[in-house]
Amino acid sequence: MARFQEFYKEKVVPGLIEKFGYKSVMEVPRITKITLNMGLGEAIADKKIIENAVGDLTKIAGQKPVVTKARKAIAGFKIRQGYPIGAMVTLRGQAMYEFLDRFVTVALPRVRDFRGVSGRAFDGRGNYNIGVKEQIIFPEIDYDKIDALRGLNISITTTAKTDDEAKALLASFKFPFRN
């Protein structure tokens, strides 16, 4: 069992029951999945970009991402339907908890001028989104082997009904909120 998964069962659940007064353990919000998405609009010019991004995401997530394709043609962006324009990977279960552990304890402190993550990036339904500007904050990425700095979106989907519950859940996982 992953360290954060054990921590959730032993410390987070009792703390949230006490704070919000849940009657059942099943009412306590939990993280269902973490989705990592890399949009690669510049990949229309060079197919190697997709391969490099897939390699980076594989190292970061620990599992192979799926290449996302354009749903429809957009002449302004010079893309046709079916063109590969991104890569995404969905983490659940033990892999999700291990990624969350590495993200909070190792990757976030490596961000330059880091003052905490925004407490306002919740979507109103208890899900949290965070953007990472460069993939080199993850220790799995070798700085000398990357071809370009690429950002990625990280979506944390929870069973929380409100943003306050989701924020309390993530804060109990030692998420460094600045406000």
Curated annotation (Swiss-Prot):
Gene3D superfamilies: 3.30.1440.10
Pfam families named in the record: Ribosomal_L5 (PF00281), Ribosomal_L5_C (PF00673)
Alphabetized UniProt keyword annotations: Ribonucleoprotein, Ribosomal protein, RNA-binding, rRNA-binding, tRNA-binding
Alphabetical list of InterPro entries matching this protein: Ribosomal_uL5, Ribosomal_uL5_bac-type, Ribosomal_uL5_C, Ribosomal_uL5_CS, Ribosomal_uL5_dom_sf, Ribosomal_uL5_N
Cellular component per GO, a single term: ribonucleoprotein complex
Keyword tRNA-binding: yes
GO biological process, one term: translation
Record bears the keyword tRNA-binding: yes
SUPFAM superfamilies: RL5-like (SSF55282)
GO molecular function: rRNA binding; structural constituent of ribosome; tRNA binding
Subunit structure: Part of the 50S ribosomal subunit; part of the 5S rRNA/L5/L18/L25 subcomplex. Contacts the 5S rRNA and the P site tRNA. Forms a bridge to the 30S subunit in the 70S ribosome.
Functional description taken from the UniProt entry: This is one of the proteins that bind and probably mediate the attachment of the 5S RNA into the large ribosomal subunit, where it forms part of the central protuberance. In the 70S ribosome it contacts protein S13 of the 30S subunit (bridge B1b), connecting the 2 subunits; this bridge is implicated in subunit movement. Contacts the P site tRNA; the 5S rRNA and some of its associated proteins might help stabilize positioning of ribosome-bound tRNAs.
Family to which the UniProt record says this protein belongs: Belongs to the universal ribosomal protein uL5 family.
NCBIfam families, per the entry: PRK00010.1
Protein's UniProt name: Large ribosomal subunit protein uL5
Organism of origin: Burkholderia cenocepacia (strain HI2424)
Gene from which the chain derives: rplE
